[in-house]
Amino acid sequence: MVYLDTDLMRFLDAQNKLYLTAFSEIKKGKKQTHWMWFIFPQIKGLGTSSVANYYAIHDLKEASDFLQHPVLAKCLIEISKLLLTFKRKSIESILGDLDARKLRSSMTLFAQVENADPVFREVLNTFFAGEEDMQTLSLLNSSSVKLAVA
């Protein structure tokens, strides 16, 4: 499946409005508003809300396309690096429990992309003792099987 820039527009549109808010909140060390879905997207199949489904990454190909997009990749890498400035804080104290789990899923997803920036692994190592999200890996594995069969 080939993804076009138009497929990623949902992220660009949302980030256009709220990326600076998300960045500012992380810089202050405390997430306060709702933006996780499109700043740190997860693989399709994890979220149950309509918003989570809308911003879900469909498979590893779309994750790769996301990281090849000049704006989306820059923003994801930049805000992920910003998180690392809080190495002495728990990620739950910054994002809350649920959003910390979403971050782990997102970092697991993007760490699987070939030649991905090492920041995704570094976030996993720093805040999650290097442990990837098993549900994300399972969903990626099942989506790659579907792609191979198609």
Which residues are covered by each model-predicted region?
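Extreme N-terminal tail/first-helix region
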Residues: 1-20, 141, 145-147
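Mid-chain, well-packed structural core segment of small domains
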Residues: 65-114
